[in-house]
A protein has these predicted regions:
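Glycine-rich phosphate/pyrophosphate-binding loop shared by adenosine-nucleotide-utilizing enzymes
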Residues: 5, 55-59, 85
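A short beta-loop-alpha structural element at the N-terminal edge
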Residues: 5-18
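Active-site rim helix/loop that mediates acceptor-substrate recognition in acyltransferases
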Residues: 27-53
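Conserved acyl-donor/pantetheine-binding loop and adjacent beta-alpha core of acyl/acetyltransferases
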Residues: 61-89
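Conserved acetyl-CoA-binding loop-helix of GNAT-fold acetyltransferases
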Residues: 92, 98-111, 140
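Conserved GNAT acetyl-CoA-binding A-motif
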Residues: 113-127
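Conserved active-site alpha-helix within GNAT-family acetyltransferase domains
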Residues: 127-147
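C-terminal "cap" of GNAT-fold acetyltransferases
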Residues: 148-167
Length: 167
């Protein structure tokens, strides 16, 4: 039987699971405790979870321009685009690999951006150390590199990516 997969707005009771999922993927994203999650959620245009048979299996946080987000990657896109949707993080529980949950979230995100008249989606992923699964995933959605920058006192380099939203 096919699992019941749904995307919905994150609820307060999802916070614990979201923080645990983020902690498990922290080498590819940035640390986030419950307080930081709440701060990000207040700035988010998309604060979604994806569920499998009712259980949270992943999440996505994305911010629009002028969200007031103090982040060097977000600032990079703010300097280049007047209207955009920035993916701060997308995390899927490894035990749900193969269900295409990330693909479902991004398909919904592109539809959402289109409905809001947003012309471009932006994000970044690590290239030092490399995050090859993220690179391959974003390539499939038409993202291309528009810059790179060093973070964490030179310990990490990210590829800053943008993809057009078909209007």
């Amino acid at each position: 039987m096919m699992p019941d997969i749904r995307i919905r707005d994150a609820a307060a009771e999802d916070a614990g699971v979201i923080v645990l999922l983020n902690d498990a993927a922290v080498q590819h994203t940035s640390a986030m405790n419950a307080m930081r999650l709440q701060e990000l959620q207040t700035m988010a245009n998309c604060n979604w979870v994806i569920t499998v048979d009712g259980a949270v299996a992943g999440f996505l946080l994305a911010m629009r321009e002028r969200a007031g987000y103090a982040n060097p990657n977000y600032d990079f896109f703010t300097a280049r685009y007047t209207v955009f949707l920035y993916v701060d993080r997308i995390v899927i529980a490894p035990e749900h690999a193969g269900l295409k949950l990330g693909t479902r979230l991004y398909e919904a995100l592109f539809e959402h951006a289109h409905a809001q008249g947003v012309p471009v989606l932006t994000c970044e992923y690590n290239i030092e150390p490399p995050n090859e699964p993220s690179r391959r995933f974003h390539d499939r959605f038409g993202f291309s590199e528009i810059g790179t920058q060093l973070l964490d006192s030179g310990k990490k380099r990210v590829s800053l990516q943008a993809a057009p939203v078909r209007q």
